[in-house]
Amino acid sequence: MRMLLHLSLLALGAAYVYAIPTEIPTSALVKETLALLSTHRTLLIANETLRIPVPVHKNHQLCTEEIFQGIGTLESQTVQGGTVERLFKNLSLIKKYIDGQKKKCGEERRRVNQFLDYLQEFLGVMNTEWIIES
């Protein structure tokens, strides 16, 4: 009986340890990355001959591929080491997060009514959060 109690407590402890999130929340990661970007801006602009394509419109969520290509270019031209490495590591984690979220865009066949609800929500976000150019 005593052994069963010990095993139960051990299992409960193991479950607790594995249930604690070990990753930093994405919102905190983004805040930290913004601070690092501000801190290392001078170092990052040291190469004034480097040209990186910048998306024209302001709907940033549509340009994630271009943004991360630019980050890759910047990283390959920046001297690595020290604290700037943390910036690029964070940016890589943010990209993984976005890529994971994009996988949720996978198609699932649903009824027309459900699609129209989704379309209405999409247009509502577009109407309130996107910068619509005339």
Swiss-Prot record:
Glycans are attached at residues 22, 47. It is found in: Secreted. The record marks 90 as: Not glycosylated. Keywords: Cytokine, Disulfide bond, Glycoprotein, Growth factor, Secreted, Signal. InterPro entries: 4_helix_cytokine-like_core (IPR009079), IL-5 (IPR000186). The keyword Lipid metabolism does not apply. Residues 1-19 form the signal peptide. Pfam families: IL5. It comes from the Eukaryota. Present in peripheral blood mononuclear cells. GO terms for biological process: immune response; inflammatory response; interleukin-5-mediated signaling pathway; positive regulation of B cell proliferation; positive regulation of DNA-templated transcription; positive regulation of eosinophil differentiation; positive regulation of immunoglobulin production; positive regulation of podosome assembly. GO terms for molecular function: cytokine activity; growth factor activity; interleukin-5 receptor binding. One of its GO terms (cellular component) is extracellular space. Belongs to the IL-5 family. Homodimeric cytokine expressed predominantly by T-lymphocytes and NK cells that plays an important role in the survival, differentiation, and chemotaxis of eosinophils. Also acts on activated and resting B-cells to induce immunoglobulin production, growth, and differentiation. Mechanistically, exerts its biological effects through a receptor composed of IL5RA subunit and the cytokine receptor common subunit beta/CSF2RB. Homodimer; disulfide-linked. Interacts with IL5RA. Interacts with CSF2RB. This is Interleukin-5. It comes from Homo sapiens (Human). The gene is IL5.
